[in-house]
C-alpha cells in the first residue's frame, strides 16, 4: 500500500512539473507541414511537404527554415514532375527554399505561458536562387513545453524569377500562390 501511495505521489509530482515547463533557448522542429495552393479558372493545384526543418530561438526570436523542394507531394505525378523540372523550380539546381529571420515583437510572445500569440516575422526568403525580404503574420501557440507556429501568406512567383510566358502552365498556375506553414517545436 505504501508503495502504491509513493508511486501515485511521484506521478502527480512529475505531471505537475511538466505542466509548468516552459520553452527556453533554441528548439528544433519535431514535425512540420507546409502546403502551397494555386487557383486559376482552369484548375486548382496543391502540394504538401512534411520534410521541412526549422529552428526557433525563444530567447532571441530568431527563426530558420529549410525546405527540401523535391519533397512536395502532389496528387498527380505529372504535376510533381513539372514542379521539379528546369522550366519551373529546377529543384536539382535549387534543392532547398530557405527562410532566415526574426520574430519582430518578441514581447508579444510568452514562451513560459500557455496561450496563442499573434505577431510578425520578418526575414530573407530564398527560393529558386532569388532572395527577397518578407514580413508575414504568424500565430505562436504555446502549450506546456511545445510551441506550434502557423502562418498563411502569398508568394508572387515572378518575385523569385519563376514565370511562364506561354503554354499550358501559363494558364494553369496562378501568378501568386498561397503558402501555409504549420510547425511544431
Language model: regions and residue ranges:
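Bacterial Sec-dependent N-terminal signal peptides
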Residues: 1-26
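Low-complexity, acidic/polar, glycine-enriched regions of mature
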Residues: 20-185
Amino acid at each position: 500500500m505504501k508503495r502504491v501511495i509513493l508511486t501515485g505521489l511521484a506521478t502527480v509530482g512529475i505531471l505537475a512539473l511538466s505542466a509548468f515547463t516552459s520553452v527556453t533557448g533554441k528548439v528544433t522542429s519535431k514535425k512540420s507541414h507546409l502546403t502551397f495552393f494555386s487557383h486559376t479558372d482552369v484548375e486548382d493545384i496543391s502540394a504538401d511537404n512534411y520534410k521541412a526543418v526549422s529552428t526557433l530561438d525563444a530567447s532571441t526570436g530568431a527563426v530558420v527554415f529549410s525546405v527540401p523542394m523535391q519533397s512536395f507531394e502532389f496528387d498527380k505525378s505529372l504535376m510533381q514532375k513539372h514542379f521539379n523540372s528546369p522550366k519551373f523550380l529546377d529543384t536539382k539546381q535549387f534543392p532547398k527554399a530557405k527562410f532566415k529571420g526574426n520574430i519582430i515583437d518578441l514581447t508579444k510572445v510568452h514562451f513560459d505561458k500557455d496561450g496563442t500569440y499573434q505577431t510578425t516575422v520578418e526575414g530573407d526568403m530564398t527560393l529558386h536562387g532569388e532572395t527577397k525580404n518578407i514580413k508575414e503574420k504568424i500565430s505562436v501557440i504555446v502549450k506546456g513545453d511545445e510551441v506550434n507556429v502557423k502562418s498563411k501568406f502569398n508568394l508572387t512567383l515572378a518575385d523569385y524569377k519563376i514565370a511562364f510566358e506561354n503554354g499550358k502552365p501559363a494558364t494553369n498556375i496562378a501568378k501568386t500562390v498561397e503558402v501555409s506553414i504549420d510547425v511544431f517545436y
